[in-house]
Amino acid sequence: MTSFNLSQAIGSLKSPILVVGWPGLGNVASSCVRTLINSTNSVVVSALDPRDHFDIEDIEVKNGVCFPGKLPQLLFRIIVTNSDHDLVVFTPESQPQSESMELAHKLISVALSTFNIEKVITFAAISGAVEPEDDPKVS
């Protein structure tokens, strides 16, 4: 099984930073990264194979024949910027069902070897006790 697929050539990136938005709690983190993607000229360049980390959760039936449903995509996008750093953005469509640390290690390994990243920025959300009258904040 191929764990990594490079769909197009990657040119020289300027001191690339890996940005990851993990889905989960209300999709807060992944929404932040999607906003970044949608406000720039990002290009999908590759993907990780989801089969080691996700199970098929549904099926499609066509003309009485069952087909496996789709697995979540684990895409890498490139954003070329006008600053000192270009961005490599990883956007998983779902949290891994198993082997989550293995996926994290694979992600970092591919990002280092393929994109030569220099830094990693991750977005994630966690719930906390907030009273209705409290002002929302980001920590």
Q: Whereabouts are the PLM-identified features?
A:
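N-terminal short beta-loop-beta anion/metal-coordinating cradle
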Residues: M1-S94
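Glycine-rich phosphate- or other oxyanion-binding loops that anchor nucleotides, phosphorylated ligands
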Residues: P68-S139
